[in-house]
Amino acid sequence: MEALILLSSQQSGSIKNNCASTSDIENVEDDDSIVIVSDSPTSSPVTLSTSSPVSSSSSSSPISTSVVPPTSSSSNKKANGLFSLIATELSQLDRSSPSSSPNTPKTPKTPKTPKTPKKTSPDSNEANQEVPKQKEVFEHTPTTTSTSTTPIKPVKDPKEKEKDLENDRKRQSFMLHWRFKPSTANNTNNNNNINNNNNINSSSSSNNNNNNNNNNNNNNNNNNNNNNNNNNNINNSSNNNSNCNNNNNNNNNNNNNNNNNSNNTQPLSPTTASQQANSQQNQQSSPTSSQTNETNGNPPEFNRGRRNSTPSLQNFVSHWKFDPKAHQKQQILQQHQQQLLLQQQEQQLQQQLLQQQQQQQQQQQQQQQQQQQQQQQQQQQQQQLQQQQQQQLQQQQQQQQQQQQQYFRPISPEHIYESPNENNNGGSFQKPNTHFHPYSRGPLGLNLKGVSGSPSHSPRVSQSPRVPSHPHSADQSPFHTPRQTERRLSLPSVPSYQAAYQSYQQQHTQQQTTIQQQQNQQHQYQQQYQQLQQLQQQQQQQQQQQQQQQQQQQQQQQQQQSSSPPSPPSPQSQPQNSSSPRQPSQTPQFYIPISNIHRHHQQIHSPHLSPHPPHSPHMPQSPHMPHSPHLMPHSPHSPHMPHSPHMPHSPHMPHSPHMPHSPHMPHSPHHMPHSPHYGSSPNLNGGKGSNNFLQSIPEVPYGNNLTNLNGSSVDSYSNSSPTPQSPPFSPHHQSTIKPCIITPSPRLLKTHNENYMSSPRQPLSPHNQHVYLSHSPSPPPSSSPHEHCNYIDKNDEYYSNNNNNNNYNNNNNNNNENCNHYHNNSSSHNYQTNNNYCNNNNNNNNNNNNNNNNNNNNNNNIINNNIIKEDKLPSMRDLLSHLNINHQDGPNSASSTPRLPTDHINNIDEKSKSKLLFF
């Protein structure tokens, strides 16, 4: 203890005088004490003035001490005075220990500031004797901090208690008073010692090894303050001014923590402690708080009438802090609140349970009602379904009747194009498209493309051709790669047409039977009606005969002989003659409902397909005959006249300028390039049956003559393509709508396979998907063999070559390894397409119409590479002007455009004019 006191005295001696005089005034008071520091500049010896508390009966007994540093002393006296001071402190502690309260702590380990003289027993002699020794100590250490505390304790209780309190304060040393509270207050602080030991450590920066749980708050506070002062003095001995501030600040913080945390179970930081102290002062400034604490069983010594004295912050804070039941009150309040919450929760749970039960009951009722409603609805739905089924059956029957009447008046597309239907299981693809169908005339909407509904198949988007992997196979299409289950040129995926033609082949036999039944019934009705007419006529004749006989009997017998023989056969011959034309007229129940197509001799335009299509073995020498020879045996194109000049079969014919092997008759009057009838160029890729998917041109009669509009050889397809299936309609009448196959002869395809045939010429624009050459405004006459089907509008070639250029540009982007390479003589670029994904070229083909005129000179290649150079597309004036130019006969005529005389146009019958299908 002596060594510690010596160290602390030496360390604290390094603090300057002025620092003590300025900063120590700011020390925070303890709960029951006020620190008064006075500095006297005089060099007189230090006088310790203490008022004896025994004789003082006043409300407060302040003890004022003033420590004045002496001016001159010796070091020997300093040491002697220090030891004597320590001895007197220990002796006084031993004296005061039995009389102090049981809670008075042990001797201090490190007294805070032994700089100041001790507060001793009422004998002031010891203090006066120790003053000069203390003066010597202060002389050696030039600075001292003298602190003197006067615990202001208002006394209004009996004098004995006051005497006890004052005696306790006397017995305690002057600086140890910081570590203790009055003995009466220690009783209330014992409960909080454990918490305070931990809470005070937060503000101290030194070792806080205060494990004395029995010590009071002052004890802990002094230890901490001493440690802080020691460390700060050691570390900061050079900075004297800062040391003063550090000491005082540490004292302030620790004192505040001690008082604030005395009753708090939760640790408080020094910043929050000071804030709470201020807030608590404001909360507890009312005098009612002291009265409530007095009535709560606190010791009366602690709750004296301290409001009568001058209140300090420590009084308010300690008074509020040391309510021992505050924590219990808070617990009681919390428990009460928890009970209230529990009650509320229980009530809520009960209410929820009730609500759930009610809801369950309601739900059960609702479910029962819903089940009943569902049962009723199911019954109603079943009834409605039955009604709907009945209605659907009726509607289907009506639709079947309407379809038979409406949709099947024109020739069915499966037999026009002879490509597989969805129900045909992939049929034969080698059958030429031999017939014309009126749905396919326009380039819009009804363009007969593939069935797939991808956006690239829209009619306005031009398609790049899908070049088949086998360019010389017989079953290739100009538009799609051969897939055996695809409808090539049938109607597009329009619901109305699908509904009309999906179940066509299934219904076809039924339709034939119904048609035959209807025809038979009509024949029977006609026969019955004719019989009735005959009976009526016979009765009339008999009556007339009787009358005539009566008259003739009166007249001469010669007149009777002369009049009677002609009269009976004449009425009999009339019904025979009237009935005979009616029977064939009644058989075609379905006729093409187009104003431009009329019956020709009542049998020519019957839509019932002939059992002998143009490639049937019955017509081996004329596969391209538009008219069957059975109907008009006197036609100049009958097989009996195979080598007639009207049927040019010479192989030299394709070399004629009328037959450029590029099928482009640029000035042909039969194809306006942008007319709605304009379709697509044929597939001339060569090999067998390269015309499989081309459209047909019906015959055009001129008077009684039938023109063969095809100039290719007769025997070109009689062997290559198989005979198509027999058409579904009545085999009694052969249709006059026969195709004009637009292909060169296979001989030419073999010889010129290098130049033009090898290039897959597949049109791309939506305008040339299908060429229907039957829409020519003025078909050629029968006498000219060279106005034949092989002229194709030059615009086809423009489109195809522009597509070549576009494909060449696009394939730089579409670096597709699967694209097949072909060389097209009509353009200087490689014609690259991909079977899989070359359709990306479609996007650039929309500009083909603008580029047509730029590529005219490179587009027309005849078989012998004779280029027909045309500068522009034929206009309507050109097309109409060529109608009046004479034509030349012969296979090698020099004219490059088909000529059409006006005589034939003027001499055409009205029925044949209606068959021109002009626009």
From Swiss-Prot:
Residues 16-25, 420-433, 678-695, 754-768, 883-899 have a biased composition (Polar residues). It comes from Dictyostelium discoideum. This is Putative uncharacterized protein DDB_G0291608. Transmembrane segments: none annotated. The lineage of its organism: Eukaryota, Amoebozoa, Evosea, Eumycetozoa, Dictyostelia. Residues 154-167, 785-797 have a biased composition (Basic and acidic residues). Residues 1-167, 179-312, 415-491, 553-739, 751-863, 883-906 are annotated as: Disordered. Residues 1-15, 34-75, 96-107, 141-153, 186-292, 450-471, 553-564, 573-589, 618-635, 712-723, 798-863 have a biased composition (Low complexity). It comes from the Eukaryota.
